[in-house]
Amino acid sequence: MIENHVGCYETGSLDFFGPLCVVACYVDQKDEKELNELELDKEMSTNDIEKIGKILKDKLTYSLLLLDNSHYNQYVKEGQKLSCIKAKLYNQAMINVIQRIEHPISKVTIDAFLAPKKYYRYLKNKIVVVRHIEFKEEMSLAMKCARILSQYAYLQYYQNMCQSLNTTLPRGFNILANDTGTFLVHEYGKDILYKVSKTNFPNYKQILERVK
């Protein structure tokens, strides 16, 4: 049987277009059987993510922090690295969840995107820092739920972006992202990239070179 625990995960850090979505969520022992029946380990389609995301959203205590592109790029402009931005969002999302849980929490788990020393170094100026975190390669049940919830939030935002721009934005950061970015600059001007993409990705400079 699992312990009562909190897990944290993010979606968006590997996508040139779209926000950064960090979710922390709490999983109770009594939820284990029902959550395992959802087969959270399987490869999921967009429909699967939307269907299961809605179930988890209604069932679990969680915190979503969504950093849109304009705010993300402002942090980058100030000299913050992606890993630093993620560490701060993870810490705040976990604080939000832990403050809402009345039961004892046995452990807190996150993906090992940073060495623990570096993670805590990024948080040295924060007044409240969640400590005694397990940095895991293998995901806990709460991390699996947080992953789905972050994907669900990202998809909702992403679909709205595609609709408002009247184009399909590619996921990832390959040549298709450059082609779409070039199209958007021709349609809306260079400033559009600051609003819809991550300017610290190589794609950003490559697109600006194309449209000179």
What is the role of each PLM region?
Residues M1-K212:
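RNase H-like, Mg2+-dependent phosphodiesterase core
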